[in-house]
Amino acid sequence: DAFYACREQDYPKDHHEDWDYLVEKFDFQANQDSDFVLKNSRPAISAEEFKGQGVDAKWIVYGDFLGDQKCSILRLIVEPGGKTKFCPESPALFHTNGGSGRVGKLDVRYHHDMILGEIYPEIGFITQAALSKGGVEIENTGTEPLVLTFDFPQHAHSKTPGI
């Protein structure tokens, strides 16, 4: 059900399955802006709070647009043998874009030749429960850099990175 993937404050439970409510809330004009990236993207900026020995991090932020903090991405690169404790402000979805390693208890590995219908260990979540316990350890167990991309939801940061 699509409504369960939405934030409660955006789509209260009493409006689940209410497609008219969804259509009223949706900003069609903003979603059809063919120049969105040109108007809102910024160069990647260093994420000093997540850098360390053998660990590089960069924010990819589209800033505040339409008067609101909408999205941000953190690219984390852990060199072979490196590890770091990761505890961002907000839960996040992550994708493995290169290498292999461990995120918390989850073994992750990037796959070059994916087959539709197969399950691959390259996508996961950093949950609020994990953050409440101090975050997760990320370790590169492979021979090439472990590249992870964390997607943060809107309003994930107390201050939009780089703004």
Kindly give the residue locations of the regions a language model identified.
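Feature targets compositionally biased, intrinsically disordered low-complexity regions
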Residues: 51-53, 100, 123, 133
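C-terminal structured domain segments across diverse proteins
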Residues: 74-75, 92, 97-100, 106, ...
